[in-house]
Amino acid sequence: MAGKKILVVEDNEDNRRILVYRLRKIGEFEIREATNGMEALEQVRRDPPHLIFMDLKMPIMDGWEATRRIREMAGGDTVRIIALTAQAMHGDEEKALAIGCDDYLAKPVVDPALVREKLERLLGVAA
């Protein structure tokens, strides 16, 4: 997975650091960060990542809207998106998949094996 570009979109600095730390332990990724959906859209327009970890509840623009807009962009359908949420409500996973997310994770992301499995499945290569 070396060289794969991953964008972590998370407004909570602690959650963002934990996920970035886990990703660095798994593989040699080019990791970028954003703190809201608007920043994520700007980064996707400039240089689309291979995969995005997208928090669903953020200020300025939430992950629901950012995912919808990414999917509407030219080439946006090739970016893999994993939805993240700390307050998993009934139906959130189904809604995330319906708006275009490829997978779903509850926060905090504490299981490195689960993250590795999702990366391998969505990026198509072994970590």
List where the protein language model places each region.
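Two-component/phosphorelay signaling modules centered on CheY-like receiver
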Residues: 13-32
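Receiver (REC) domain active-site loop signature in two-component systems and cognate sites
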Residues: 58
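Conserved acidic carboxylate
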Residues: 10
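Conserved Asp/Asn-Gly motif in the active-site loop of CheY-like receiver
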Residues: 34-38, 93
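Active-site beta3 strand of CheY-like receiver
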Residues: 47-53
